[in-house]
């Protein structure tokens, strides 16, 4: 598993009791080429090697299931390869930069809902291949037919509004 601190984030964020790190599972930081990036690799392995666009960015021992890398962000592909104590590859995991197009994905947790039941639906901006675009900031308004909107939330720290609103405005 690879997680990256938001590359564009200049100000410090306070972590909550629910959040152990501010790193996100994304390599889609549009406009951030050449910026420093902190990468966390989580693995049950002896060591991990990180590759950026096919070139090794170094190898690190894994401590408490995590290895940290400080690298320079480049669009493309980031791959973590984990190795056992004998240097044999045991796993690899990659993230890719998102394409230019932006799509609002609507992903319900369940295909059907019982009467009086709740539907949990994730809204997420991606490219046409489904690669998450965490830097996208747009206004979202939700309308529900044949039901009631019980809450609308976002984990983003820069969002105005509360859980009972029907729309969110992202600050830029």
Residue ranges and their predicted role:
Residues 143-158:
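Short aromatic-acidic-glycine turn motif
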Residues 1-115, 128-132:
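Substrate-binding clefts and catalytic carboxylate motifs of secreted carbohydrate-active enzymes
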Residues 169-172:
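Conserved small/polar residues in nucleotide/adenosyl-binding loops
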Residues 134-140:
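Short, ordered, surface-exposed loop/turn motifs in non-cytosolic proteins
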Residues 58-62, 157-163:
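Short, acidic Ser/Thr/Gly-rich low-complexity loop/linker segments typical of extracellular
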Residues 116-121:
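Short, solvent-exposed loop/turn segments enriched in Ser/Thr/Gly
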């Amino acid at each position: 598993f690879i997680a990256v601190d938001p590359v564009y984030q200049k100000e410090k964020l306070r972590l909550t009791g629910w959040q152990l790190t501010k790193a996100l599972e994304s390599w889609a930081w549009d406009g951030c080429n050449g910026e420093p990036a902190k990468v966390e690799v989580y693995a049950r392995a002896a060591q991990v090697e990180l590759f950026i666009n096919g070139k090794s960015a170094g190898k690190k021992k894994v401590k408490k299931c995590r290895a940290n890398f400080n690298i320079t962000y480049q669009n493309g592909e980031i791959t973590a390869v984990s190795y056992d104590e004998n240097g044999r590859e045991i796993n690899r995991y990659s993230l890719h930069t998102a394409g230019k197009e932006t799509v609002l994905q609507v992903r319900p947790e369940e295909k059907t809902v019982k009467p009086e039941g709740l539907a949990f639906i994730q809204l997420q901006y991606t490219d046409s291949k489904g690669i998450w675009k965490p830097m996208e900031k747009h206004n979202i308004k939700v309308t529900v037919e044949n039901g009631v909107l019980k809450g609308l939330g976002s984990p983003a720290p820069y969002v105005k509004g509360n859980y009972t609103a029907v729309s969110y405005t992202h600050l830029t």
